[in-house]
Structures are given as C-alpha cells and as structure tokens.
C-alpha cells in the first residue's frame, strides 16, 4: 500500500534510513553458500550493489568455499561482512577443524571484514579454553575479529542464551594478549571497524521519529525513551518490531516492551512475505534444507523458535518503493 500522505523531504529521509539498515543475507535455515543456495545469495548481494545500497551487508556461514567462489564473491561486494563459523563442534561430515581454519584464513585474505564466529558456546561441549584457545589463535592470524555467544535451546522459545561470564573473561584476556577484537555483539565489531552508530548501545536521544511514524509504528515517548504501542493500531508489539525500530531511531533509548518474543515483524514485504529483524540485522532470506547439519540448530523447522516457512525479507529499498512510490 502506497502512503501518499508523506512529503517529499520526509520520503528522502525514509529512503536514506532504509538504505542504510544493516542487512544479513540468507541466514535463516540453510547455509548461504551451500550449493543450492549459492546463486541465490550471490544474486541478492549483486542486487543490493546495483541499488547502490549503503548499509552493511552480512552473511553467516559454516560452508567451505573454493578460491573461485571467494573471487566471485569479492567482485560482487569486497566490503561484505562474513561471519565465518568455527565452533569446535565438528559440524559437517568430513570437514576437519584444519579445513575450517584454512577456509577462514583464505577468506581473510580477500575480505577484511571476515569475523571468526565461535557461536554457540554450549555447556560441557565447547565451553573450555582447551577448545577455544586454538580457535582464538587462528583468529589472531587472520583479521583479528572474533564473535562468540551463548547457546539458545531450540526446544524453548522463551529461553535466553546461556551465560558464560567467567569464560567470557578468559576469552577476552587471551584476545587482548593476541590483539583480537572480541566485541560482545556483531554490531559492536561493525562499529569498531566502520565507526557507524551501534543502536544497541548508543546512549543518545532517539532520531528519525517522524520516519518511524511514517513507517506505521505507533509509539509514545516516555522519559526520553520510545515506547512502542503497536503497528498500524494493532496493539501488538513483537521483538522484531522493537529491533527494527531501534535501528531506525539509531539509539538504545527504546523499551523492550514486546508482547511477542518472535523476531518477525508485523510489517509485511512487497510480496506479503514475513519480515524479520534481530538486534543487529534486518534479514533477507530464502529458506532451504540445511546441508551443514548442526545438531544444535535453533532455526530449523520443528523447533519452538521456528515461526513460519518460506522466504522472508527483501531489499529495504524495495520496501521503501512498496510503501512510498506509486
């Protein structure tokens, strides 16, 4: 539905906001670089480039890429963020830890925004420095960027990620010694590298409130914080709505008052597809059966966290076109 009640100056600002959202590609169910997903992932990256998309673009993967694929990917977008998964949990038949180390280092040679992603850390599985030290040492040989995080039980959508405060200190201590940046979130690492605002931690007055309203979000301001009260008079707030609004206002000054814990948004895409937003990324994904086979996966069909089958998301610029262009 086209919104004709927005003036041209505001439209320009809305387009700028949407075209600067951080976006993750094909990180739903199915690895973005597995054979039956490779072309789709590559096409999405190229499409964003053709649109002159200004936001950070990311893929999370545990797939082993050939040098030819790395070259093709580099030509599509040399500034791509690649979260390269190495957990020590032996995912994928016939893939050794050394194979994963080699894959990571080859990616680092071409992509300066390759991050070694050792997530999840699962209690009594890979949550020890005996397992993590060799992984961190390899991160130090690459781009010196490390992401780690807790385990989310796929059988319970209301569970939070496991905490590992003491281990976190040990990881950080070794990272400091080796010169590795182990930002607590993807968004922290992105900010460290690019200098862009990290909405999760930005302690400042909310911006773009007129943009948020024009996009259909109902909200109040309470003690300087945005308090969502619904979307287009729905009276419902999802976790995805809050995450998306936080990215728009470029501030942490928003209440986590969601009434639905799923990451999907109430806004729909140009083809009425589900839209998904997490704390760090807006999602654009095609769902395919995953060929990596992570036994701990929390987004595969049948888990409590899984919400809806099929494709989700779109280019945010296409979202703008749907809402504000005839």
Which residue ranges define each predicted feature?
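Conserved Radical SAM active-site core
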Residues: 1-81, 279-287, 294, 298-326
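Conserved non-cysteine loop/helix-boundary elements of the Radical SAM core domain that shape
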Residues: 3-5, 29-37, 89-105, 122-133, ...
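Conserved radical SAM core fold
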Residues: 23-34, 63-67, 80-95, 118-125, ...
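Conserved C-terminal portion of the radical SAM core fold
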Residues: 99-156, 170, 174-187
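C-terminal accessory extensions appended to soluble enzyme cores
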Residues: 155-326
């Amino acid at each position: 539905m086209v919104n004709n009640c927005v003036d041209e100056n505001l439209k320009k600002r809305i387009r700028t906001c949407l075209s600067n959202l951080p976006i993750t590609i094909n990180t739903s169910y199915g690895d973005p670089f597995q054979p039956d997903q490779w072309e789709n992932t590559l096409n999405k990256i190229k499409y964003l480039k053709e649109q002159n998309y200004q936001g950070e673009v990311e893929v999370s993967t545990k797939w082993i890429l050939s040098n030819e694929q790395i070259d093709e990917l580099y030509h599509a977008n040399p500034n791509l963020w690649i979260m390269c998964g190495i957990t020590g949990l032996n995912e994928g038949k016939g893939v050794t830890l050394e194979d994963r180390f080699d894959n990571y280092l080859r990616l680092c040679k071409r992509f300066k925004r390759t991050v070694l992603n050792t997530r999840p850390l699962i209690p009594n599985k890979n949550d020890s420095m005996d397992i993590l030290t060799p992984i961190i040492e390899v991160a130090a040989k690459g781009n010196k960027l490390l992401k780690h995080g807790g385990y989310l039980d796929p059988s319970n959508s209301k569970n939070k990620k496991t905490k590992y405060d003491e281990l976190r200190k040990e990881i950080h201590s070794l990272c400091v010694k080796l010169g590795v940046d182990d930002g607590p979130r993807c968004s922290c690492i992105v900010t460290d590298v690019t200098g862009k605002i990290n909405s999760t931690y930005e302690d400042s007055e909310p911006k773009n409130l007129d943009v948020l309203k024009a996009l259909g979000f109902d909200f109040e301001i309470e003690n300087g914080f945005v308090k969502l009260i619904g979307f287009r008079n729905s009276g419902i707030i999802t976790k995805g709505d809050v995450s998306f609004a936080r990215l728009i206002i470029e501030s942490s000054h928003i209440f986590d008052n969601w009434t639905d814990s799923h990451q999907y948004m109430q806004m729909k895409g140009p083809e009425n597809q589900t839209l998904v937003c997490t704390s760090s990324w807006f999602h654009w994904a095609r769902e395919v059966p995953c060929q990596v086979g992570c036994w701990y996966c929390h987004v595969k069909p049948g888990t409590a966290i899984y919400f809806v089958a099929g494709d989700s998301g779109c280019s945010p610029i296409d979202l703008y076109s749907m809402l504000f262009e005839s």
